[in-house]
Structures are given as structure tokens and as C-alpha cells.
Amino acid sequence: MEGMCVKFDVIGLDSPCVDLAVNVRCFPKPNGAERIQNLSWQGGGKVASGMVAAARLGLCCGIMGNVGDDKYGTFCLRDFQDHGIDTEQMCVRKNRTTNFDIVISDEGSMGRSFVFYPGNAECMTEEELNIEYISNSSYFYMANLDSV
């Protein structure tokens, strides 16, 4: 792959998601409504977000994991690539969906709440893990063992 690192600083393992992040002044009461102040589409997931942050700081990063072959999976892969993260080891599951979250933050409490749709793209199997790829990194970052 052109531009790939000889050795990675960090490789992550994750089942990334797409976040629709919305900000409201306050949460509406039941059956109420509140105007959205701001919204954005973002790649998400603990490890995925960490990889993007590390890449923005100049580290050489790679990501392993799974997405569906839907528009959200395409979004995740493009977002990693736009940040210079190697996606060679990502598994794209045919006829499967990628995790999706709506992240609601409100100015009143300064908190965040999540509403999520778990995609059905299966996690990587042990057989799909490329140990040579992982060993070509100074650090390996994963959030939980459910990723495999």
C-alpha cells in the first residue's frame, strides 16, 4: 500500500460506528420537541476515535475490525483513510450493517446520551487476525474482548 508505514506506532482493533452528533439547548419533555442547535456526522467507537486522535497527532496508525458493506461502513473506512489510517486489515461484511449511534448532548447538563443501532456485521474471528500486522506495531489498542 502506498504511503504505508514501515512500522506502525499503534494499531487498533474495533467495530467502529457512525455517530450522528446533535446538540440541543435542553432535552425535551416527553412528547415535547427541541430545536437542534448543531449537528455533525462523525466516525465513532472508543478505539476508532483513539486512532483518529493519534493520527491527528502525527502517529502512524492502522485499524483492524469489521464493518458492513452499507453506507455507514463506507463512511467509516473513508474517515479512517482521510486521516491517514491504514485500513488494509478491515473486514467488510457482505449484506451486513455497521453500528450506528445518535449522540445527543445538551447545553443544560453538559452531558451526552446515546441511542444506538447495533449493526449485524460479525466481529473478526481469531483466524482473521493478522498477528504479523499486529507485531509490526509499538502498541496495540483494543477496548474489549468482544471485538474478536
Which role does the model predict for each range below?
Residues 2-18, 66, 79-92, 105-148:
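Ribokinase/PfkB-type carbohydrate-kinase core domain
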Residues 102:
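Active-site loop ensemble at the mouth of alpha/beta enzyme cores that anchors a bound cofactor
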